[in-house]
Curated annotation (Swiss-Prot):
The keyword Phosphoprotein does not apply. Present with 7280 molecules/cell in log phase SD medium. Keywords: Cytoplasm, GTPase activation, Protein transport, Transport. It comes from the Eukaryota. GO terms for molecular function: GTPase activator activity; Rab GDP-dissociation inhibitor activity. Residues 106-112, 234-259 are annotated as: Interaction with YPT1. GO terms for biological process: protein transport; small GTPase-mediated signal transduction; vesicle-mediated transport. This is Rab GDP-dissociation inhibitor. It comes from Saccharomyces cerevisiae (strain ATCC 204508 / S288c) (Baker's yeast). InterPro entries: FAD/NAD-bd_sf, GDP_dissociation_inhibitor, RabGDI. PANTHER family: RAB GDP DISSOCIATION INHIBITOR, RAB GDP-DISSOCIATION INHIBITOR. Regulates the GDP/GTP exchange reaction of SEC4 by inhibiting the dissociation of GDP from it, and the subsequent binding of GTP to SEC4. Plays an essential role in the yeast secretory pathway. Extracts GDP-bound YPT7 from vacuolar membranes, antagonizing vacuolar membrane fusion. It holds the Pfam family GDI.
Length: 451
């Protein structure tokens, strides 16, 4: 990029091209803000990039195999787009809404994930996608199925302003455990509703007011209803397409991008100590505020106390007992293994253009609870059958120490162990509110803007 042509003054500087940062730069550009977006790395995605097989070996293996051996086993490098952080989109979730409203769906194609499964007593079972599937599900006995059907009917017919639909329950006063009790649901049903539908990672939610759980279960049911089969969507060519889609949105609205540009120095105003700009090899750039991922300001972040282990597994066969599904999610609830946190397994395949023909990618993640984290993943490995290659990494989770108002430095959170993007979009909305002073209201792009 020719230094002569680059402006030096902006409304916002964004550091890092993770999905959180790219959504925010896209939204702020649409709002008319002049955005400069910089990444020290030479590719989009930050911690949540999609990488080729050779990059994967480079990142995780001490002694990578030769190119010849790799290609004879796994095919061409260009056929691989492997997510470093596994997540699916809820079909009716907030990220999908943002994609549709900003029209980023023009740049990214999606495919439905074939199924959602839950682990129970050593086997995996399909999570019922609706009342009809609940009736035929082997997860429950005949009387429990009726109770489950009534529970799902209550969820779908509940109206806030119609007390007759409330069944005597107050979502803000009754706990979720009391809701389950009202419908007479047993422990194993509570487990798969709470973990495979509401997608809670532990059981703390049982003693909390029911509303957040109600909303999560409703989101799950509405997401399933949108396309059938499962509530999840996944982008063709991997999750790395999402930051790039929002980067294109930002560029259409005048955003400037610089990859492979390390930050040499952060500048602060002498009198107030607030953010003033950054120095790079391409020059000095100024803006009244910055949005960044935690790696740019480690001193302004603190550990959440949690570490996540993720294992990327290459298979040359579908996962056993899943009807040869080309993609699925398996949730292993914590109580099944005597753990505090669930284990998630996300499986995609060549149907999504993320690996060479005949291969499958299974990515396992959980919050570490012992000093032997790789052993914690053993139950998930067993479900996959023979594994051709395995890459394992551990990430500490960080969050900002302050809200950014003092120094105008607004930091995103690390990507958690959850299997979907809802917590990430909460972070987007939270940062957007702190930066602009008003809540994010999604507006459809104007037709003339789409040209």
């Amino acid at each position: 990029m020719d230094q002569e042509t680059i402006d030096t003054d902006y409304d916002v500087i964004v550091l890092g091209t993770g999905i959180t940062e790219c959504i925010l730069s896209g939204l702020l550009s649409v709002d008319g803000k002049k955005v400069l977006h910089i990444d020290k790395q030479d590719h989009y995605g930050g911690e949540a990039a999609s990488v080729t097989l050779s990059q994967l070996y480079e990142k995780f293996k001490q002694n990578p195999i030769s190119k010849e051996e790799r290609e004879s086993k796994f095919g061409k490098d260009r056929d691989w787009n492997v997510d470093l952080i596994p997540k699916f989109l809820m079909a009716n979730g907030e990220l999908t809404n943002i994609l549709i409203h900003t029209d980023v769906t023009r740049y990214v194609d999606f495919k439905q994930v074939s199924g959602s499964y839950v682990f129970k007593q050593g086997k995996i079972y399909k999570v019922p996608a609706n009342e009809i599937e609940a009736i035929s599900s082997p997860l429950m006995g005949i009387f429990e199925k009726r109770r489950m059907k009534k529970f799902l009917e209550w969820i779908s017919s509940y109206k806030e302003d119609d007390l007759s639909t409330h069944q005597g329950l107050d979502l803000d006063k009754n706990t979720m455990d009391e809701v389950y009790y009202k419908f007479g649901l047993g422990n194993s049903t509570k487990e798969f509703i709470g973990h495979a539908m509401a997608l809670w990672t532990n059981d703390d939610y049982l003693q909390q007011p029911a509303r957040p759980s109600f909303e999560r279960i409703l989101l799950y049911c509405q997401s399933v209803a949108r396309y059938g089969k499962s509530p999840y969507l996944y982008p063709m060519y991997g999750l790395g397409e999402l930051p790039q889609g929002f980067a294109r949105l930002s560029a259409i609205y005048g955003g400037t991008y610089m990859l492979d540009t390390p930050i040499d120095e952060v500048l602060y105003k002498k009198d107030t100590g607030k953010f003033e700009g950054v120095k790079t090899k391409l020059g000095t750039f100024k803006a009244p505020l910055v949005i960044a991922d935690p790696t740019y300001f480690p001193e302004k972040c603190k550990s959440t106390g949690q570490r996540v282990i993720r294992a990327i597994c290459i298979l040359n066969h579908p996962v056993p007992n899943t009807s040869n599904a080309d993609s699925l999610q398996i949730i292993i609830p914590q109580s099944q293994l005597g753990r505090k946190s669930d284990i998630y397994v996300a499986i995609v395949s060549d149907a999504h253009n993320v690996c060479s023909k005949g291969h499958y990618l299974a990515i396992i993640s959980t919050i570490i609870e012992t000093d032997k984290p790789h052993i914690e993943l053993e139950p998930a490995f067993k479900l996959l059958g023979p594994i051709e290659e395995k890459f394992m990494g551990i990430a500490e989770l960080f969050e900002p120490r302050e809200d950014g108002s003092k120094d105008n430095i607004y930091l995103s959170r690390s990507y958690d162990a959850s299997s979907h993007f809802e917590s990430m979009t909460d972070d987007v909305k939270d940062i957007y509110f702190r930066v602009t002073g008003h809540p994010l209201v999604l507006k459809q792009r104007q037709e003339q803007e789409k040209q």
